[in-house]
């Protein structure tokens, strides 16, 4: 009733407890298990925040903003903008779950001196409202944590790639 939230938040034990306490404070008689039973049923639709973001975007106006973004990177490779465009479309396709059979096996690799805004460019790929699905800190030496990050984040900037050992590269 009064405690309804309009913004997506990841659900954890703390959030479940808050839902139960808020409902009880509003006079709704229930048990903790009632909340879990409802939340983990088909009555609550699966929510994908990136899909929701993409769905709310206006229709495409025909302007190629991806190649325009790629062109902001100083690069002598004549294929850079086309390759970045292909990678970007594949990334979004994977966000939407269109291609679960194949992984995106291509990743842009930005090479340059310290302080040339490589990480800033990577961060700018994600819109501000979706930046919680971006990270630039991943530790490949801890396999379990790395696998969790690969599932949790939509875009991972592997900063200092030259320091990742060949066994950790895959």
Regions found by a protein language model. Give the residues of each.
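Generic structural signal for alpha-helix starts
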Residues: 31, 127-128, 165
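Intein modules and their embedded homing endonuclease domains
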Residues: 1-60
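P-loop NTPase catalytic core of nucleic-acid-dependent motor ATPases
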Residues: 38-152
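Conserved AAA+/SF3 P-loop NTPase catalytic/coupling segment centered on the Walker-B
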Residues: 154-170
